UniProtKB/Swiss-Prot annotation:
Gene source species: Aliivibrio fischeri (strain MJ11) (Vibrio fischeri)
Family annotation (InterPro entries): Dxylulose-5-P_synthase (IPR005477), THDP-binding (IPR029061), Transketo_C/PFOR_II (IPR009014), Transketolase-like_Pyr-bd (IPR005475), Transketolase_BS (IPR020826), Transketolase_C (IPR033248), Transketolase_CS (IPR049557)
EC number(s) per entry: 2.2.1.7
Protein name (Swiss-Prot/TrEMBL): 1-deoxy-D-xylulose-5-phosphate synthase
Cofactor(s) it depends on: Mg(2+); thiamine diphosphate
Length: 627
């Protein structure tokens, strides 16, 4: 349910950018206050990304006020911060549906609005896309302006610098806005972020500035000289020097929460020629004290009461697979001082907070740099250490060449703990972990494990850690099954599955064997009970348990493979390839994710829609058997 807009009288007059631009400039600060309150009250009722949007309210208002969107094109990097943009571009009444099935997309999405120029979700893509648009805008000669907004976390990625370097070389008319809030999802790391965080606060700059003021403050002429010297010194210290060297005209840093100052600055920059760089300083979670104090926790929030000073506690219950991984890391590090855990800026989401505190010398946050994270691990493996890369399935896509070139070709013992494998829920198309089995299965030397529950996950993590070549353990987002986890760890035999249920031998009907890969096992067993089918927990997508497959082929009329991965190229395809290679002709029904980008919705909702719940599995098998 949308909020009562009558409580937000100025925001009510700005449902579109055209309406916003008709407002007097004097009303913009009050509009920002209402927009921030509306955002807080809406997201707290529905859940979603909060702190990022709170931090860019003034910037969003100023950009749409100065630029003639949608003719002028505005690109948001990643998109967590785009809720105010959605509110001001005709989607205010639908904000209560964001991240829900059939609701507003969680990020800017081309199919949703003409104001969303680029569909986003992954970081560091905005400058490259903006550069492409700017090149074409110049060719069209329509005086179209192009703006990209990127955060201080996203700009650390190599792709962003590749785009900056190219833009500085060819000199198109475009604006890059750096939203510097000293915080991405996890705390930013790396030399660049350290420099950004030290703007105007470095000891050299501060001591010279303050010392000079004390000595020379009494002389007006000297004071003016001191001011100029201060500006010159600033140019040597702050990141502007670096961006100027890349070919950009650097302006900043500017207060990102002074909307009228932002409007003035943007108007001044709008018609400047060549690549422009505006550096603004903001506070993530601005205007809501709990989010300002803890922007990591308030990055993505459940439903909560804004009048409380903390988010609701988890109800406990079943552990998440991420927590199982985190516990494994801590337990394994007790006995292996050469274990090295790497994450590309996903410490909290990957369950690594405790490990990072207890074993700081074995923990490495590579920042938003998946390519670097993978090759960093290869270097550690070459040095005789035991690296583990904790990475979301969707982000491993960004390190694919490194997985092949820097790990698999050399057969290095790097284990990939692949979180968010399968459907992730509310984040939708850009974050579904739909492809990792498919793109890893074709890589020589890879071992791919698909645990069905948390205990199997723990044992597979141990198996991968002890393996002498590259391996991957893939597991889904969210709660595990709740079974007892065996603290003792034992390496599994590579490429061996297990038979869990056997069909009764009858002369009636076709005998069905379900080959399960991963956490659909409970659904498979439930469907099998109704169908009297055999169920095998295959465990390994590569190498396959070929002996078990041969046994199932011999004793059954139909095979059914099931996995939470794209059907195309997945584990089921591997089963068929093995059968054809060995002239084992048998009908095979492949169940999994269809050949489409799957939209947002809860995992349960989407499993039902895709007929991957127990009832759906049963029905698909019955339809295939024509029962």
């Amino acid at each position: 349910m949308s909020l009562d807009i009558s409580k937000y009288p100025i925001l009510a007059l700005a449902n579109t950018p055209d309406e916003l631009r008709s407002l007097p400039k004097e009303s913009l600060p009050a509009l920002c206050d209402e927009l921030r309150t509306y955002l807080l009250n809406s997201v707290s009722k529905t859940s979603g990304h909060l702190a990022s949007g709170l931090g860019v309210v003034e910037l969003t208002v100023a950009l749409h006020y100065v630029y003639n969107t949608p003719f002028d094109q505005l690109i948001w990097d990643v998109g967590h911060q785009a809720y105010p943009h959605k509110i001001l571009t005709g989607r205010r009444e639908q904000l209560s549906t964001i991240r829900q099935k059939d609701g507003l997309h969680p990020f800017p999405w081309r199919g949703e609005s003409e104001y969303d120029v680029l569909s986003v979700g992954h970081s560091s893509t905005s400058i490259s896309a903006a550069l492409g648009l700017a090149i074409c805008a110049e060719k069209e000669q329509e005086n179209r302006k192009i703006v990209s907004v990127i955060g201080d976390g996203a700009i650390t990625a190599g792709m962003a610098f590749e785009a900056l370097n190219h833009a500085g070389d060819i000199h198109p008319d475009m604006l890059v806005v750096l939203n510097d809030n000293e915080m991405s999802i996890s705390e930013n790391v790396g030399a660049l972020n350290n420099q950004l965080a030290r703007v105007l606060s470095g000891s050299l700059y501060t001591s010279i500035r303050e010392g000079g003021k004390k000595v020379l403050s009494g002389t007006p002429t000297i004071k003016e000289l001191l001011k100029r010297t201060e500006e010159h010194l600033k140019g040597m210290v702050v990141p502007g020097t670096m961006f100027e060297e890349l070919g950009f005209n650097y302006i900043g840093p500017v207060d990102g929460h002074d909307v009228n100052e932002l409007v003035r600055t943007l108007k001044n920059m709008r018609n400047l020629k060549g690549p422009q760089f505006l550096h603004i300083m903001t506070k993530k979670g601005k205007g809501y004290e709990p989010a300002e104090k803890d922007p990591i926790s308030y990055h993505g929030v459940p439903k909560f009461d804004p009048s409380n000073t903390s988010l609701p506690k988890s109800s406990g219950g079943k552990p998440t697979f991420s927590a199982v991984f985190g516990d494994f890391l801590c337990d394994m590090a007790k006995e292996d001082s050469k274990l090295m855990a790497i994450t590309p800026a996903m410490r909290e989401g990957s369950g690594m907070v405790r490990f990072s505190k207890e074993y700081p010398n074995q923990y490495f946050d590579a920042a938003i740099a998946e390519q670097h994270a993978v090759t960093l691990a290869s270097g550690m493996a070459i040095a005789g250490y035991n690296p583990i890369v904790a990475i979301y399935s969707t982000f491993l896509q960004r390190g694919y060449d490194q997985l092949i070139h820097d790990v698999a070709i050399m057969d290095l013992p790097v284990m990939f703990a692949i979180d968010r494998a399968g459907l992730v829920g509310a984040d939708g198309q850009t974050h579904q972990g739909a492809f990792d089995i498919s793109f890893m299965r074709c890589i020589p030397n890879m071992v791919i494990m698909t645990p069905s529950d948390e205990n199997e996950c723990r044992q597979m993590l141990y198996t991968g850690h002890k393996h002498t070549g590259p391996s991957a353990v893939r597991y889904p987002r969210g709660s595990a099954t709740g079974i007892q986890v065996n603290n003792e760890m034992q390496a599994l035999e590579i490429g061996k599955g297990r038979l869990l249920r056997e069909t009764k031998v009858t002369d009636k009907g076709e005998r069905v064997a379900i080959l399960n890969f991963g956490t659909f096992l409970a659904n498979s067993l439930e469907a099998a009970e109704k169908l009297d089918a055999t169920v095998a927990d295959m465990r390994f997508a590569k190498p396959l348990d070929e002996a078990l497959i041969c046994e199932l082929v011999t004793n059954h009329d139909v095979l059914v493979t099931i996995e939470e991965n794209a059907i195309s190229g997945g584990a089921g395809s591997g089963v068929i390839e093995f059968l054809m290679k060995n002239r084992l002709v048998k009908p095979v029904l492949q169940l999994g994710l269809p050949d489409e980008f799957i939209a947002q919705g809860t995992q349960e909702e989407m499993h039902i829609e895709l007929k991957l719940d127990s009832n759906g599995i049963e029905q698909q098998i019955r339809d295939y058997l024509d029962l």
